[in-house]
């Protein structure tokens, strides 16, 4: 008896399968719901210095004592980055990062014209491992360095 097993579109990350907290569609629906609720959440703001040339800010949105969204914004001479961490209980289930690049450095022209944007969504398992990625809404393979990069992003939450 011969059995042939074919794996299509599966990227091995380690010896254990990576199961995201929610499916991609469920994650996107939860993100959309949470984004619409921010006005109803309590929030606190802290400055984030030393992580970009022009500084940054973090806004933490809470429902009672429960974190729902941590929003980080970093500013630089050639662009800015906007990153949101989405929580289910104490678990981050998704990170969405928007990178914006300016036509010219802000020191040359402070009336910013945007050259390009790129939005990356990272979908995590309950242990913070990246199980899925999309770029501008299109599914992509998980980059080799994604796990370490996401650990650094999470470690930067104040």
Q: What residue spans do the PLM features occupy?
A:
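Mature extracytoplasmic domains of secretory-pathway proteins
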Residues: 60-110
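Bacterial Sec-dependent signal peptides at the C-terminal "C-region" and cleavage site
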Residues: 4-19
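Low-complexity, flexible helical/coil segments
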Residues: 29, 96, 104-109, 131-134, ...
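C-terminal partner/receptor-binding element of secreted or periplasmic proteins
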Residues: 117-118, 123-158
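N-terminal secretory signal peptides
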Residues: 16-77
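Short, surface-exposed coil-to-beta transition loops
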Residues: 53-56, 78-83, 114-119
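Ser/Thr- (and often Asn-) enriched beta-sheet segments in non-cytosolic proteins
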Residues: 45-47, 58, 101, 120-123
């Amino acid at each position: 008896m011969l059995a042939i097993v074919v794996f299509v579109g599966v990227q091995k990350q380690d010896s254990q399968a990576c199961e995201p907290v929610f499916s991609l569609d469920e994650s996107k629906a939860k993100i959309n719901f949470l984004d619409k609720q921010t006005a109803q959440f309590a929030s606190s703001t802290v400055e984030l210095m030393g992580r970009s040339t022009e500084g940054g800010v973090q806004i933490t949105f809470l429902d009672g004592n429960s974190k729902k969204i941590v929003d980080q914004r970093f500013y630089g001479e050639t662009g800015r980055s906007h990153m949101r961490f989405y929580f289910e209980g104490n678990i981050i289930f998704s990170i969405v990062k928007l990178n914006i690049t300016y036509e010219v450095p802000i020191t040359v022209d402070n009336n910013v014209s945007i050259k390009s944007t790129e939005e990356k969504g990272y979908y995590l398992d309950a242990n913070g491992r990246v199980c899925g990625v999309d770029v501008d809404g299109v599914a992509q393979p998980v980059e080799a360095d994604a796990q370490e990069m996401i650990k650094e992003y999470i470690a930067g939450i104040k």
